[in-house]
Amino acid sequence: MRKHYLKYLPVLFLLIFAASCKKDPKVAPTVTQPGNFAKLGLYEQVSGNNRRVFIAVSKIGTVSTTDYGLVFDTGSTGLSIDASGIIPASMITSSGFQITGDSVNVNGITITSQTATLTYGGVDGSIKEYGNLAYAQVTIGDGNGNVTTPRIPIFLYYKVVNVNTGTQLAAHSADVFGVGPGVSATARAIASPLSYFKLPDNITSGFRLAMLNSANFSATATYTAGLLYIGLTSDDLNASNFIMHPLTYSPIAGYLPNIKSTITYNGQNVPGTILFDTGTPATTIIENSAATSNSAALPANTVVSISTDQGFSYQYTTGTDFNLTQVENPSYSNDLRTIFSIDFFVSNEYLLDYTNHRIGLKNN
């Protein structure tokens, strides 16, 4: 999400040896390759031109939640969730949580006195969440399959506001499951909830996101099985044809998900960096310092292509409903990054290796 600075049990590695005697031929051992730590489904939904992919969170601390689908967001880092329905209403005020001392424990959640704000969105509209650093176990997924994290840092917010209008938004309307690398720039104790699992030695910390199913984007959130693989196998990293991109380190937010690329459209070759962002629901934003206007939409049937420094390439054609694309001048947006929307993930697979700080991209 564009942001201005915001079960399986592990499969054991088995060696199965065939018994033999003098008269029997020798049988080579069969090796069972390690599997991913967990494999979960996600929910796909569309409203107008806006596509969303959600991940279920069915428990925070000791509280079982209902219909808490969080935006699955490769463009931000950390889990942020509204406190409503999770802690007693008497603890929540319009100006903060009722906390005495450094922290309070309630419903299996430790809420600290450390406050922060998280901001999501771009120049055309953003939201700001007000809350505190908290710690809890989190059950990711639901009855279709789930896995529970160890006790991890999360952002528990008491208020969310539309920055442009000042309007306070409804509870749980801006819950985010940020899986990007590094840490949240404004709450730097918080990293991706997928990065905290204790994994077997032969599994690498990270995740793989399968290509989204365009047919499952409907007005009602539709469960799509097998989209998210938690924990990366050697095959994921070395034998799945992902093109790997090393990430750049920032002292503020840790490793950044931005990939050096050249973007081409209408005969222009624009060097820059790209954020591939499931949290951007509709419009790809190309940042071009040579743009003659602050912001302008590319017309339908415009061909846009990219080539990364590591050799990944992708091309699409703009439409009237999807693959919408806007060109902005960074002097207007105050953001140098080109942001590719969720539409990219309908045609491509995505992998994030937390351990080795790299992103893999793969055409399908």
Regions picked out by a protein language model, each given a short descriptive name:
Residues C21-N364:
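Pepsin/retropepsin-fold aspartyl endopeptidases
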Residues M1-Q33:
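Bacterial Sec-dependent N-terminal signal peptides
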